[in-house]
From Swiss-Prot:
Entry superkingdom: Eukaryota
SUPFAM superfamilies tied to this protein: Translational machinery components
Protein's name in the database: Small ribosomal subunit protein uS11c
NCBIfam families assigned: PRK05309.1 (NF003698), uS11_bact (TIGR03632)
Gene from which the chain derives: rps11
Species classification: Eukaryota, Viridiplantae, Streptophyta, Embryophyta, Marchantiophyta
Stored HAMAP family: Ribosomal_uS11
Subcellular location, principal: plastid
Length: 130
């Protein structure tokens, strides 16, 4: 039994992770990168807002690239070699985040677009009038 929460967190963080799943959620306002193991437990995450971008700068492709690099930095220390990528959302940072993941040297088994598409469900919001 670990003596304290710090020991428990240290023990958990040393676990090797050969394979993982990288989820990219790109909205119009932010880009969130979550990395899980194959069972779905979160290992690492990052977002444009967590990287220090605020307001309209969170929705830029550069902010998404920075968020992806921050999330992957932890994984490389844990020995991640292969990953699957799930991209959802229509945001501007989806391609840049994927490019940053490809540059990191992790072998991508597949890249899947899991954006939810309605089969004529709810009525979309009206156009902006500025």
């Amino acid at each position: 039994m670990p003596n304290s929460m710090e020991e428990m967190n240290l023990r958990r963080s040393r676990r090797r992770l050969p394979r993982g799943v990288i989820h990219i959620q790109a909205s119009f306002n932010n880009t969130i990168i979550t990395v899980t193991d194959t069972r779905g437990r979160v290992v690492s995450w990052s977002s444009a807002g967590a990287c220090g971008f605020k307001g309209a700068r969170k929705s830029t492709p550069f902010a998404a690239q920075t968020a992806a690099e921050n999330a992957i930095r932890i994984l490389i220390d844990r020995g991640l070699k292969q990953a699957e990528v799930m991209i959802s959302g229509p945001g501007p940072g989806r391609d840049t985040a994927l490019r940053a993941i490809r540059r990191s040297g992790i072998v991508l088994n597949f890249v899947r677009d899991v954006t939810p598409m309605p089969h004529n469900g709810c009525r979309p919001p009206g156009k902006r009038r500025v």
